[in-house]
């Protein structure tokens, strides 16, 4: 089996697709455990704490004898993906992707990846993954909702507009303040999950993709509202987040069922009740 010849399994699929992979993973890992080879399984998904889910699913499918040896030969590690990818739809085989920052992974015990470009080991991976929602996804959502308000179709257009940029920058500043305040992380750690200060070559990215599902993205614990709440509680400047949230409630896309549901609620009961509900 070809997969069993590799020391590192780097898996980049959606969480819901792992169920189709477990039989292959178990077969390959069984071969490697029997042969005494150590394996690092890197779970490249933005779902929080998903490596433990993958590990438990692998263990539940292993023979009892191999289960006892699992921890001696297999490590399943959490990662953070920091990239932007765009396609016309979810079945299109042509896509554009851009690495915004190095991907991050928990320190490995079984294999050396120090010479692999584009990935680095770091501690606090679960905290950083949670914070990425605020430091990266927050400004991105702010750019999308302000860009929609200004009549743009792509993030690229919004990035050239000072109105959109000012809101996204303010959201980014508050996110960094929240990261320092709530988790006491040093600036170099926060920079690993923040937009780079140097300009990178952009890819075409649609506002409809980034703005999709405003119900989730305007949730109380999500990318825009939670930092704003922390800002209110700690006398921080949350005005950029307030603007982004307000513009999010204006987002109206007929092709987005979540947007349609939110707009229907606003029309029926008014914005104040809609804000409380969503």
Language-model-derived ranges and their functions:
Residues 1, 5-14, 19-278:
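Substrate/ligand-engaging "lid" and interaction regions
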């Amino acid at each position: 089996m070809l997969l069993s010849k590799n020391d590192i399994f780097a898996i980049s699929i959606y969480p819901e697709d792992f169920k189709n992979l477990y039989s292959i993973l178990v077969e390959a890992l069984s071969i490697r455990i029997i042969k005494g080879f150590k394996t690092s399984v890197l779970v490249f998904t933005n779902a929080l704490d998903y490596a433990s889910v993958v590990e438990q699913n692998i263990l539940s499918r292993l023979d009892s004898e191999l289960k006892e040896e699992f921890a001696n030969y297999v490590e399943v590690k959490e990662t953070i993906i920091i990239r932007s990818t765009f396609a016309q739809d979810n079945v299109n085989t042509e896509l554009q992707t851009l690495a915004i920052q190095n991907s991050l992974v928990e320190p490995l015990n079984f294999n050396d990846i120090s010479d692999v470009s584009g990935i680095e080991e770091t501690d606090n991976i679960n905290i950083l993954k949670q914070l990425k929602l605020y430091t990266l996804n927050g400004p991105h959502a702010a750019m999308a909702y302000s860009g929609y308000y200004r009549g743009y179709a792509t993030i690229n257009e919004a990035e050239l507009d000072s109105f959109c940029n000012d809101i996204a920058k303010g959201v980014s500043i508050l996110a960094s303040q929240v990261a320092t305040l709530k988790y006491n992380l040093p600036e170099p750690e926060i920079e690993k999950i923040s937009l780079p200060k140097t300009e990178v070559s952009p890819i075409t990215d649609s506002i409809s993709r980034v703005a999709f599902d405003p119900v989730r993205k305007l949730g109380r614990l999500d990318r825009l509202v939670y930092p704003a709440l922390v800002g209110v509680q700690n006398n921080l400047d949350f005005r950029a987040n307030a603007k982004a949230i307000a513009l999010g409630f204006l987002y109206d896309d007929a092709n987005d069922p979540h947007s349609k549901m939110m707009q229907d609620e606003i029309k029926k009961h008014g914005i104040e009740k809609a804000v409380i509900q969503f």
